[in-house]
Amino acid sequence: MDTAPDHREPQEQGESRKWYEMTASEFYVYVVAFMCGVSMMMSVNAVFSAPAYIMTYYRYAMQDPEAVPLYTNFWNNVMTYYNLIGIVTSLIMEPLTLLSWFRRIPIKVRLLGGLVILIVEIIVLMVVPARGTSEAGAVATICCTGFIGGFGKSIFESTAYGMFGAFPSSFTSTMMGGVGMSGVLTSLLQIIVKAALPDSYEGVKKQSKIYYGLDVGIQGMTFVALILLRFNSFAQNYFGDLGAVKSKVDAGKLSAEALCHTDEHPTHDKEGRNSSSGKEVPALGEVQTAAAKSEGPDAVEESSWPHEVEGPTSNEILVATAIFSTLRRVKWMFVACAFNFLITLFLFPGIAVGMFPDSKWFSTIAVFIFNVFDVLGRFSPSLKLMWPRSYKQRWIIVAASFARVIFVPLLLLHSYHYIPGEAYGYVMEVIFGFSNGYVGSMALVLGPQSKGIDNDGKRFVAGTLMGISILVGGTIGTVLSIMTQTIRERH
């Protein structure tokens, strides 16, 4: 019997212990969850925080401050192209992470590998200008880094969402808060750097080095923190393979028969008997002595099952988990999350903050306000009063997601100056940012807690599916944004 002091106890939904009531190992896992959230979006935020650098990247790549571009359409829309390449790559790659061959890869390898790829993206952006290349080479570099970032993000994001989806909901909420805090950090730094450094060729170059250096530094610290996580007893109660030992995770209703034959789906009656054989199939991770005792005392000692069997590894549970069955369980939270980010990326940042192109500070301050209230919304599920009162009231989150469509006319009218004034834009960013963080975070937290998600394999897959929902909504929203911006330019 496991007597480790950090053995997990069930927690009420949305409820987390005060930091001073936690063990050191539990608090450390919260810190790692937060750092994973920050690192997840840090590369994208670093690129978007230095738009002047990326939009004139050809000058730095050609090492010529007076260079005139030939591919004007690409450089005028370079941020959109970069974002679209990354999102489409993630949308293609992230579902592949659910395939059985990928799920056999140890969790720690996926986390560290995805993080290394994200670091490589930023290193490439910094190395190419140092070595020098042509404008075509600069275009290829932007496209390649968009692909590299999308590839690394899909691996790191799907694994992180899945892993922390198997922990109590407060860990997912903390990770989501880290995602929002990444935007706050880069926005705050952008304001400071923009005020301190000139917008000259050398000034913009220094700005990019600050943003990219911060990104690599934070992701490097996250890399080290994840390595140390394998020695954390609290984390091993959820994913033992992080420490290269047998997992103590909850196998739920996953049977030994299902684990050995993942392509077969035996049915069981209410008493846990296999309907085809009539035999009881004990759950993995439970004491397996009843069947042996029925054969006599000698059979207990000779049984191939030990008196108390260690649970399967996390990867064994994942391989035995049905994807589409899990998707049916989380479908409404999947839809709510996808539509939430569809609306957000349709309007933000292009439409929501681009209505005053001649203003030096409007877009910078508007993005900062959005990020601050977005992170407040992402942390709000840590307050129990922000949760639906019962399981049946989860429809409120779906309704809130679809209600955000009201921002489309409100922000479009402002972008066309039918509603004048910068103050209106700032107020809208407060509501828009908080609603994005709250709805997105609640959907991501509630998804792995849906009925029928009864073991950690399903919770991991549910968390991964919720991460995919962000990409689905984000891709559609980005495409709609490009179409809208194109129509605006022509008319």
Swiss-Prot record:
Subcellular location: Membrane
Domain of life: Eukaryota
The keyword Transmembrane helix appears for this protein: yes
Compositional bias annotation for Basic and acidic residues: 261-273
One Pfam family of this chain: Nucleoside_tran
Coiled coil: none
Protein name: Nucleoside transporter 1.2
Organism: Leishmania donovani
